[in-house]
Design a protein with these regions (language model features):
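N-terminal beta-strand-loop-alpha-helix module at the start
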Residues: 1-67, 425, 434-440
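A charged, amphipathic alpha-helical module
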Residues: 152-254
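Beta-rich, aromatic/charged-enriched effector core domains that present basic-aromatic interfaces
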Residues: 75-196, 368-373, 388
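Short catalytic/ligand-binding loop motif for oxyanion handling, primarily in non-cytosolic enzymes
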Residues: 12, 37-38, 100-103, 128-132, ...
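A structural preference for short, hydrophobic beta-strand core positions in alpha/beta folds
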Residues: 29, 69-72, 119-122
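Residue-level signal for inorganic ion chemistry
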Residues: 21, 92, 135-136, 233, ...
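Structural alpha-beta junctions
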Residues: 23-25, 62-66, 112-121, 204
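C-terminal catalytic domain of photolyase/cryptochrome flavoproteins
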Residues: 45, 65, 189, 211-440
């Protein structure tokens, strides 16, 4: 018996653990639902809803192959005990993930147990080096992994019935999830949607990507929007990369596609950083920076995360992010920079709150970017964004801001950009120039 464990590889197509686990004997496919994980650092309902979208399609696709999807509710220690009680000769198949510390700690012990018994098959993910990290060969290794052949479709199995295994079906499990059904404006998960986005991006939407990605007005449609699909594995990075390489020669916007190609490489570079240095989840790259900003001010942080800073452009970005679960990279950087420099709040307090808003939360990328935008790496020069300048540059007529904050409809663009709205809007939370000067 093979047991295939799903985590953030929620797809049937090009899934190494699923392919090999179902190709070499009877397989029990299990998604591990650990409530404590979903309450962990930066995790949230909007992400869980996306994961369940993906699992719903996985369940449908597997059913057509006569393979039921089961849900195990508990942590990995509980799972180990359950496996040993029911399938003590089984082999565990899983893909490797770089995730929050809670996941790493629980799965490391689980993997050691099955590795010692020689009952573990684990497969690489994202081109991450898990042992003997060597930066000199990292790029060539990554390239080699990304160009490996896409795995063939998994085979249809003989109908399987597992009796008395005390696992929930996905259908029964999902019927209990009433809260996430209220989340309606964020991206929808699943393989079908992932491939649709990939195709429209490569054929149409990437035109102008290199320029449009900076604007919250245009980025919503000009960016690939594949980030949550890559984060939750509803499409493999290898599939995205190979489709991109195939599209470039005949494209009328090669420059834009090459720009996207660089970002696929950076994606894995940042995840590798957290894989190699997991302590970065809570500790600054430069240790002396950890006490730089004190314990933090709850009231200030609350106004920031709620989008109640008094700066219309920043507040509009936060309102958009809370609705959609996504905003473009430059605005993410500005939001974090404002919290760390202008408001002088410790990144350890603001980072998880911001992560919870992102449907595409990828811990390795988020944590590295947060530290860079907070000036605690000891490597990168501090970059302090001017919210007022970004407001003018990205939304000159303030129409996008007004679409997010309708109460500003009767104000001029200039007064909105300058955050000079008297008592009719929220009082500004800080003096932008004085706070930036002090931070420098």
């Amino acid at each position: 018996m093979n047991i295939v464990l799903l985590h953030r590889d929620l797809r049937v197509h090009d899934n190494p653990a699923l392919f090999h686990g179902t190709s070499s004997g009877s397989a029990l496919v299990v998604y591990v639902y650990d409530k404590s994980y979903w309450q962990g650092n930066g995790k949230s309902d909007i992400q869980f809803k996306f994961a369940m979208d993906c699992l719903s399609e996985v369940s449908d696709r597997l059913r057509k192959k006569n393979i039921p999807l089961h849900i195990f509710e508990g942590n990995y220690e509980n799972l180990k005990n359950w496996i040993e009680m029911n399938f003590s000769e089984s082999v565990v198949f899983m893909n490797h993930f770089t995730d929050i510390g809670y996941y790493k700690k629980s799965t490391d012990k689980f993997k050691r147990f099955y590795a010692d018994l020689k009952r573990l098959k684990i497969y690489e993910n994202f081109g991450i080096q898990t042992k003997n990290f060597n930066r000199d060969v990292w790029s060539s290794n990554w390239q080699q992994i990304m160009t490996k052949p896409i795995l063939p479709e998994i085979k249809t199995s003989s109908p399987m019935v597992f009796k008395n295994i005390e696992l929930n079906t996905f259908e029964n499990f999902s019927s209990k999830l009433t809260l996430i059904k209220q989340i309606t404006e964020s991206q929808v998960g699943g393989e079908t949607r992932a491939f649709e986005l990939l195709n429209t991006f490569l054929k149409e939407r990437a035109n102008g990507y290199a320029l449009k990605m900076s604007s919250p007005v245009e980025a919503e449609f000009a960016c690939s929007r594949l980030s949550p699909h890559i984060a939750f594995g509803s499409i493999s990075l290898k599939t995205v990369y190979q489709s991109l390489i195939e599209a470039i020669p005949n494209s009328f916007f090669k420059k834009d596609l090459y720009s996207f190609k660089k970002r696929l490489h950076w994606h894995c570079h940042f995840i590798q950083k957290l894989e190699t240095e997991p302590e970065l989840e809570f500790s600054s790259m430069h240790p002396m920076c950890d006490k730089l900003r004190g314990e933090g001010d709850k009231e200030i942080i609350e106004k920031w995360i709620k989008g109640e800073t008094g700066f219309p452009f920043l507040d509009a970005c936060m309102q958009f992010l809370k609705k959609k679960g996504w905003i473009n990279f430059r605005m993410r950087a500005m939001i974090m920079s404002f919290a760390s420099y202008n408001l002088w709040q410790p990144w350890q307090k603001t980072s998880p709150l911001l992560a919870q808003l992102f449907v595409d939360y990828e811990p390795g990328i988020h944590i590295c970017q947060v530290q860079m935008q907070s000036g605690v790496t000891g490597i990168n020069l501090p970059r302090i964004y001017s919210v007022n300048k970004q407001s003018r540059d990205q939304d000159p007529d303030a129409s996008w801001i007004k679409s997010q904050i309708p109460q500003l409809n009767n104000f001029s663009a200039n007064s909105i950009h300058n955050a000079e709205l008297a008592e009719t809007y929220k009082e500004i939370i800080c003096d932008p120039k004085a706070s930036a000067k002090k931070a420098r």
